[in-house]
Amino acid sequence: MTEKKEFQVNKNTPFWDASLTDQERIDWLLKEMTVEEKLGYLASSSPDLPRLGIPGVSVGGEAAHGVEGRNDQNGLGKPDVTTSFPQPIGMSASWDPELIRQAGEVTGTEARVVWHRHEGHGLSRWAPTVDLERDPRWGRNEEGYGEDPVLTGKMAGAYIRGMQGDDPKYLRCAATLKHFYGNNTEVGRGWKNSSIDPRNKYELYLEPFRRCIEDGGAEGIMTAYNKINGTIGILNPEVTDILKKQYGLRHVVSDGGAMGLVVTLHHYFGQHAETIATALKAGVDAMSDDPRMVEQAAREAYELGILKEEDMDRSIRCMMETKLRLGVYDRENLNPYDRVTEDDIDSPKAREICKELSRESIVLLKNENGALPLDKALKAEDIAIVGPLGDAWYQDWYGGTAPYRTTFLQGMEVLKQENITFADGLDRVVFRCDGKGLAVAEDGTLQMADEPDVFIKEYWGEGSYTFKSVRTGKYLGARLSESQGEKPKMGQIAADREEAFDWFVMEIFHVEPQEDGSVVLTNRFHYPVYRDAEGFFSFEQTEGTPITMEVVENGIEKAVAAVRDKKQVLLALGCNSVINAKEEIDRNTLELPEEQEMLLDRIAEVNPNTVLVLFTNYPYTLQKAMEKLPAIIMSATGSQDMGSAMAEAVLGTYAPAV
């Protein structure tokens, strides 16, 4: 946990007196604060006020489908285990607002527990995302609730009501809608303009925000990076004119780093002082940016006379209203939602709600001749599961650390109480260079060796590969730390991580065939793999080193052999949640990865009793599957019960549609 500078909290002031109205308490605070102190209170991370004995409380933290408490970016230490529900697009597919409300209640309660662990963090969460799914290629489709504003408003509104609770005075936690508005593409979102005509604006783009504020009671919203009809999201006066005055919204924050981007990407203003002055006047109350930069920009704006103390007071008031409703500044602990214990995380009730919502989020896309559910007479030995998603569970960026992760194979084997034949359909390959093999050394680095290591080649489409060592179970990728290995080097290639995961997924490779049959491997930034004179491999901005990639086991043929004599085949295909589609990355195609299509073709050809089990957070074109297979069933990822819920649906022990 980050250390907070110790000072004496002083609760013997009107600010801490819950018998006063919130406005009276804030009036006292604003009267007592100096201009200098107010300049430091315009960022989402607010500092302590030692002179007044008031500790700082930050807003922020993710909760798309449960509390995100990985703590891999905020310096708070080891991950907080929290309940992980299906992705929002999956929750919405349940069409069950009461069940989603219960999931929101779990999220809000667990946020309270995490708050007590890391006091000052995580009670105002940046969720849900209510941007409409306007393009199936959008990289963040998983975070939204669908393409319909009514559905989005109802389902996201239910999640909000659960998160915040129904007490007339206090909040369980605060929900913050994302992103106001027209945020429907990732590539270029920091500078692009969304041109929206009046009818689409009011009937589609604004409607989910209106419903989630007026009906769901959302406490805040986050502005978008993009321009809307030429106006940058953080500078948009509609924040006040529509959200606050018409819909009754309480507070507004900027997206992360948005204040700085007005100068560096939009090139709209020449200095941050102009940005913060205009943003505060537009109605944005807190800048989610470097607090020191925010404070300095505010100081310069104040000294220039373009930012008034009344502008700061208005924004501080809006943010303080939410903080008081959270109960964090009460002299006595009066918030009924604060009576939580460690037992409220991953509780039996939370598990029950997650399992039920995971079941209900499953969608049956095709079912001819009663192919599903499977015949109850089928034994485990009659079934084969094949495909890269059959025994996989992939972490997504806005998901937390789940208490457990259930894959489809695991779920099926638990219900059948026996092992089931499984083949992932992925090739096993070895790499060679200058007559020697490539292997993972004891320190994890990729080095020359007499005997090459075998790697599982995972192909995710759009040229993106990952390679996992069969021997160590870890993925090849680029080290970003200079403190590892015998020859520390930025960008050195090593097999260090058990999953391909990060903001920039450094385990992604692209394979560029050469005329002589060799390949050059490059990373996502197209830096090639280079071998230096000492035999170490790294990504460099230079000519790549040719490498031979040899298939030593054909994954598709192994899968074909596994299914040939089975009575039933379950073909598990789909996506990795952080490859090819996530924040800052849009898809370029709606097709399944080519190798998954090839696997589908071969399996359908060999065994017509094949059901496609699809684990995905975004749409695919499934023409081949619709033509060749009798049944298709789909689930979003993200749930700790993903695999077991799907197994129940496939075997008929639970019927999602009933």
Predicted regions and their residues:
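Glycoside hydrolase catalytic-domain context in secreted enzymes
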Residues: 1-658
